[in-house]
């Protein structure tokens, strides 16, 4: 209002930017890095706001720091060198991503990933108790059994025959199979166990028909 009593008003819209968008995608497909996957660089990626295109996302893993740039579509990614991954101990690792936007707002998000580079130890018990399958035993079902890491898939190969089993929560596997197709002679049961991370362990057991 001026001295003559005239009044005027003005307005302006102010946008308050107090939030930052930042996510981390699933790592190595299933958030489990196997031994085979650790032999190559591991990609860590995610998304941010398209408004933050060109800004830097700082990623930390196991004490190492890496930088990624937000792309025009809001995505970002960085490759962690295989040597850095292999330097970590098996177990749960925390990946942290941090970003500060143009308004000065900062955000940091964590993502858990499991490093499992240890091949499962697999065993197979004596076949037909004494590793000799008699004619009478061959006429029925023969139990193949053993142990491996819990929840592993097990493939048993004997000559041209292939059988499948799965370990239970205690790591025990068992399957009843027919060996009637095998002629008399010496054979080897080859066993491959693959754990949830994709690591494989092998063993074998000779037996006689």
Outline where the language-model segments fall.
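Surface-exposed, short loops/turns at beta-strand junctions within beta-sandwich domains
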Residues: 82-92, 178-186
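Hydrophobic/tyrosine-rich beta-strand signature of extracellular beta-sandwich/beta-rich modules
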Residues: 93-97, 191
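Short strand-edge motifs at loop-to-beta-strand transitions and within beta-strands
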Residues: 74-78, 171-177
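Flexible, low-complexity linkers/stalks enriched in Thr/Pro that connect modular domains
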Residues: 2-25, 105-125, 203-209
């Amino acid at each position: 209002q001026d001295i003559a009593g005239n009044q005027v008003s003005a307005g302006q819209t102010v946008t308050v930017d107090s939030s930052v968008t930042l996510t981390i995608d699933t790592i190595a497909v299933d958030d489990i890095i196997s031994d085979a996957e650790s032999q190559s660089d591991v990609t860590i990626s995610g998304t941010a706001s398209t408004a933050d295109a060109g800004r830097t996302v700082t990623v930390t893993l196991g004490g190492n720091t890496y930088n990624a740039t937000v792309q025009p579509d809001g995505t970002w990614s960085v490759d962690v060198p295989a040597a850095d991954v292999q330097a970590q101990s098996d177990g749960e690792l925390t990946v942290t991503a941090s970003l500060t936007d143009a308004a000065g707002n900062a955000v940091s998000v964590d993502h858990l990933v499991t490093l499992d580079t240890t091949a499962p130890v697999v065993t197979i018990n004596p076949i037909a108790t004494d590793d000799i399958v008699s004619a009478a035993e061959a006429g029925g079902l023969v139990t193949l059994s053993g142990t491996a890491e819990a929840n592993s898939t097990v493939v048993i190969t004997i000559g041209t025959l292939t059988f499948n089993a799965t370990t239970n929560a205690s790591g025990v596997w068992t399957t009843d199979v027919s060996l009637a197709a095998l002629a008399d002679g010496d054979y080897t049961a080859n066993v491959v166990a693959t754990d949830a991370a994709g690591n494989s362990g092998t063993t074998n057991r000779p037996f006689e028909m």
